[in-house]
Regions:
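Short acidic, glycine/proline-rich loop/turn micro-motifs
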Residues: 14-18, 210-211
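C-terminal substrate-binding/catalytic lobe of Rossmann-fold NAD(P)-dependent dehydrogenases
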Residues: 62-68, 77-238
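Conserved NAD(P)H cofactor-binding loop of Rossmann-fold oxidoreductase domains
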Residues: 7-9
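Short, solvent-exposed loop/turn segments at secondary-structure junctions
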Residues: 12-13, 53, 148-149
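N-terminal Rossmann-like NAD(P) cofactor-binding module of classical short-chain dehydrogenase/reductase
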Residues: 1-4
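Rossmann-like NAD(P)(H) cofactor-binding subdomain of soluble oxidoreductases
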Residues: 16-83
Length: 238
């Protein structure tokens, strides 16, 4: 079984995802208890914001092995980056293979070095200035949608991202996708959920991959992970 958790208060204009911690933590506690009691063997895909914190909270509430509790942010963030690159180059989105790691928020880490269009690195297709602009827009894409909607937050792309992950689990597709996973030393981070490349199959996260990151990329990823780790301690008491 796969349970996709979307329950929670949506962002309003001017809010960060982290502004939702208190309200949505209570909802995740209730939903997690129900999953634990009625679907004890399920793989859980969390969509609720703030994503990485609520995924960690869900794992603690259910007591499930961490490989069976996953956050969907990386697939969503990568899809947004692919869309912006396709707009810039006038190419098909299907030809864009992006990679976005880190938390689902302002600290996310787009990786241009690992992003290609038709197998060609985007560093060879556009200027550094445009790459940086697209990376920044990727990080703020959710807020852009919230502002335009005025009430509520994004739903089409998150729904599509969750469906991609669920299909990989249900059919044991073993797709390599970026998702919020529980780290136990990978990338120098421990006891935190953060977006990293992983293999998704019938057991949930089958494997986490450690990319060869530059010093700056690794520092950005660790900064993102430590931000959420501090939030877990200071706000949720973990």
């Amino acid at each position: 079984d796969v349970v996709v958790v979307t329950s929670g208060y949506p962002r309003q204009p001017g809010m960060t995802r982290e502004d939702l911690i208190g309200k949505n933590a209570e909802i995740i506690a209730q939903v997690g208890a129900g999953i634990r009691d009625h679907a004890p063997d399920a793989v859980v895909i969390v969509v609720t914001n703030p994503l990485d914190l609520m995924t960690y909270h869900m794992q603690k509430v259910t007591g499930f092995p961490s490989n069976r509790v996953i956050g969907q942010a990386g697939v969503l963030d990568s899809a947004r980056m692919a869309h912006f690159i396709a707009l810039e180059l006038g190419c098909a989105e299907e030809d864009v293979s992006p990679m976005v790691l880190g938390g689902h928020g302002d600290t996310m880490v787009p990786l241009p070095r690992y992003t290609t269009v038709g197998g060609i690195p985007i560093t060879q297709l556009m200027s550094q200035e445009r790459i940086e602009a697209i990376s920044a827009r990727t990080a703020s894409g959710g807020g852009e949608i919230v502002k335009l909607l005025e009430r509520g937050s994004a739903f089409y792309a998150p729904g599509s991202a969750a469906a991609i992950m669920a299909e990989s689990v249900l059919n044991n597709r073993r797709r390599l996708l970026p998702a919020s996973c529980h780290l136990t030393g990978q990338y120098g981070l421990d006891e935190v959920y953060i977006g990293v490349p992983c293999l998704l199959g019938s057991n949930g996260v089958e494997q986490i991959f450690e990319l060869d990151l530059s010093e700056g990329e690794l520092a950005s990823l660790q900064k993102s992970g430590n931000f959420y780790k501090n939030q877990l301690k200071d706000v949720l008491g973990y």
